[in-house]
Regions:
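Small-aliphatic-rich amphipathic alpha-helix that forms the alpha element of a beta-alpha
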Residues: 48, 67, 94, 135-180
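N-terminal amphipathic, basic helical "cap/leader" segment at the start of enzyme domains
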Residues: 1-133
Length: 180
């Protein structure tokens, strides 16, 4: 489906998810992430680039585990995360849209919790190349976690937090030889 078609259908409220491909599990337990790292930061930065072509095969579970941990996993016993957020609000939730369903990443248990048994990739945005990517990460702000942040600042703080998470994803992807 082209980007223009998606925009038109979205404006009319007619953009719909596709049926799930396969059976979604209620919980996907992720293996421990590989936190050793393989490349120096400057090499990772030199490799970072975006593409519109993705392999159609699923990401191996150990790679997905490390990707999600890098994005917004817990890296301290006190619940601290790999990406910063203002006053530690941790207001961003990371969802993973697969062909068989959509999941919420739970950093505390390092697991994915099923939230929808449909293929939501085509309705997570308007870029047509995401429709068939092996997965799509979606960052959603939960304003109820931002009560200590002035209302006028919440949108910009949440955008900064989501940007930090996205940057972690880009850096991990470049270090692991993945495309974004």
């Amino acid at each position: 489906m082209s980007t223009l078609t998606k925009l038109a259908l979205g404006a009319m409220g007619q953009l719909r998810p596709r049926p799930a491909k396969g059976d979604a599990r209620a919980v996907i337990k992720l293996p421990a992430p590989d936190t050793r790292g393989a490349l120096p930061l400057m090499q990772v930065l030199a490799r970072r680039r975006s593409t519109r072509e993705f392999a159609r095969k699923p990401l191996p579970l150990p790679v997905l585990s490390s990707l999600l941990w890098a994005a917004f996993g817990m890296n301290r016993r006190d619940g601290g995360r790999t990406a910063p957020s203002a006053i530690n609000a941790q207001e961003i939730d990371v969802y993973v849209a697969f062909p068989d369903g959509a999941y919420l990443y739970d950093a505390r248990t390092h697991a994915l919790q099923l939230v929808a048994s449909s293929d939501l990739r085509r309705i997570t945005g308007y870029q047509d190349f995401v429709d068939d990517a092996p997965l799509d990460l979606v960052y959603v702000v939960n304003h109820s976690r931002m009560k200590l942040i002035p209302v006028a600042s919440r949108e910009s703080y949440a955008a900064a937090a989501a940007g930090a998470i996205a940057q972690n994803v880009y850096l991990y992807a470049a270090s692991a030889g993945l495309v974004t």
